Amino acid sequence: MKLLKWGFIGCGEVTEKKSGPAFNEIEGSKVIAVMSRNEKKARSYAERHKISKWYTDAQELIDDPDVNAIYIATPPSSHATYAIMAMRAGKPVYVEKPLAANYDDCVRINRVSEQTGIPCFVAYYRRYLPYFKRVKAKLLVR
């Protein structure tokens, strides 16, 4: 199995407590670089999580030859920009919901994914939580 070597764009609460921790807990996946525009935040996050590389520029993280997949956990207004940058660099993208801030940006992301053949996935991790499974089961009964 090829190791997914993730670069995180964004070092906020989602990467700390929600989706982020799982990236190092599953087989074949490791976070190797993080990026925040705030240098102190990027450095602190990397140190606390024993990640060797940190950046303040998204393009530098995307261009890192050791990073082979990108996770975007920033405000939705920046999702399209970062997702398109990563796909154009040939790197698969996993982006926090919502995919983008508006319909036009969603269309742009999908278009670039189709043009490049690089996948872009939305982090709908909650659909597998027990509560949501129960809701789904109740809805399917009707």
What spans do the regions from the language model cover?
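Alpha-helical elements of Rossmann-like donor-binding domains used by nucleotide-donor carbohydrate transfer enzymes
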Residues: 18, 44, 60, 69, ...
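N-terminal Rossmann-like dinucleotide-binding module
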Residues: 1-49
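A contiguous active-site-proximal alpha/beta segment in oxidoreductase catalytic domains
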Residues: 100-142
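Structural detector of well-ordered beta-strand residues that form the stable sheet scaffold
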Residues: 32, 55, 94, 119-121
